[in-house]
Amino acid sequence: VTIGERLSTTAPAVNKAFTERDPEPIIKRAKQQLDAGATYLDVNIGPAENDGEDLMKWAVQLLQSEFDNVPLALDTTNQKAIEAGISVYNRSKGKPIVNSADAGDRISNIDLAAANDAICIALCSSGMVASDNDERMMHCQNMLERGMSLGMEAEDLWFDPLFLVVKGMQDKQMEVLEAIKMFSDMGLNSTGGLSNNSNGMPKHIRPIMDS
């Protein structure tokens, strides 16, 4: 599964399009990602504290109507907005993804995913990046137990060891790769933001690293 991440309010053009409910820039970026091989699209509307529910519904309906019910990851800290997006989501091509939970203040997003038969990206942290793989696995186990106690299948929890910036944290990269192997050995799914690796690198280098 490849999740396209370029529909994010961190990009000024996308933020403007979401704010103005302008479909064209959203559709254009979505098509570019799907043409490049994305199988899911991440819809990051930011905190969206004022109009998040309406905005997420609008974005979900726009993208799924334009691209044959493309599966989506709903990405916001606003839980009500995620629930609103799920309420209009068509599952024919795949379950919605809740992006994301962690083992700290955001662990309730696992509850949200369980209640809505959704996949949940589970960040192996508790607000801060884990210091080592022992800590990552502790967080992983806590979230796995939480999800399964609520009736989730283990396959619907996608564990993210948190990819780190190569430019300043090269010594930590092997730990992240080892964590992915540990997840696999446990029969668990993993995911990660590959573009985090290239953050801060020269623009001509980033596409090579991200690929």
Regions found by a protein language model. Give the residues of each.
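Domain-level signal for soluble alpha/beta catalytic cores
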Residues: 1-157, 164-211
